[in-house]
Design a protein with these regions (language model features):
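Active-site core of metal-dependent hydrolases
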Residues: 1-37
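Structural recognition of alpha->loop->beta junctions
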Residues: 1-4, 47-55, 76-89
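Hydrophobic alpha-helical scaffolding
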Residues: 4-6, 38, 65-69, 83-87, ...
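Hydrophobic alpha-helical bundle architecture
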Residues: 10, 27-29, 33, 40-49, ...
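Mid-to-C-terminal alpha-helical segments outside catalytic/metal-binding sites
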Residues: 10, 78, 84-194
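Histidine/acidic-residue-rich catalytic or RNA/ligand-binding cores of hydrolases
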Residues: 13-19, 36-46, 65-78
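Short beta-alpha connecting loops at secondary-structure transitions
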Residues: 30-36, 59-62, 75-82
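Short acidic/histidine-rich active-site segments
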Residues: 51-71
Length: 195
């Protein structure tokens, strides 16, 4: 599941959070947006990417908005320069593109690895060029957010949030342990394999 553009999502924080939790893909075209909606400097792409949303780059009306023969490469080049993206960021964005694509499973396995469908940490680092530590960071934070939502739904959210606020500023592992200590009463959820 994905949508094109989605640049107004930065103004709707609660909806943005739901997109993050469900990892709904956002395919954004900064060059097109630059001409039609927002200048590159105001484009929310880097903010959405840094927050862990499933964003990728795309083209939109390449004959109108692009100057080169390879519109998608142009989008990647402009995004890298404009948003100060690292090569690891670029690899993650490209991986997201394959994940969001409508290509057949065989194609995705070729570019992401045999077990990619199990989750981000199962993508083959040698194929995606996304370091395992980055994939683990993204996957673990997503799983922790899902745990928190499950605890809130089970009416344990207040006490857990209070305990987390008490330990605010501590290492992420402290928050992870607080969530895990409160989780045994809950049913399992799909993201547990990412912890």
């Amino acid at each position: 599941e994905s949508i094109n553009h989605g640049i107004n999502l930065d103004r709707q924080v609660s909806l943005q959070y739901l997109y993050y939790l469900d990892q709904i893909g956002l395919s954004i075209s900064p060059l097109s947006n630059n001409f039609l909606f927002r200048k590159i400097g105001a484009n929310p792409f880097p903010k959405l990417f840094n927050r862990g949303l499933n964003v990728t780059l795309s083209t939109d009306d390449p004959l109108l908005f692009h100057m080169s023969d390879d519109a998608l490469l142009e989008e990647y080049s402009v995004a890298r320069a404009s948003f100060d993206l690292s090569m690891t960021d670029m690899a993650e964005i490209a991986r997201n593109s394959v994940l969001q694509s409508g290509f057949e499973e065989d194609f995705k396995r070729k570019w992401l690895g045999e077990e990619y469908a199990k989750g981000l940490t199962f993508c083959d680092e040698l194929k995606t060029h996304v370091p395992l530590i980055r994939a683990k960071f993204r996957a673990e934070h997503l799983a922790l957010e899902h745990m928190l939502v499950h605890l809130i739904a089970a009416n344990k959210g207040k006490s857990v949030l209070k305990e987390m606020m008490t330990h605010f500023g501590l290492a992420r592992d402290a928050h992870r342990n607080i969530l895990l200590n409160n989780l045994p009463d809950l049913e399992s959820f799909p993201e547990q394999n990412q912890l």
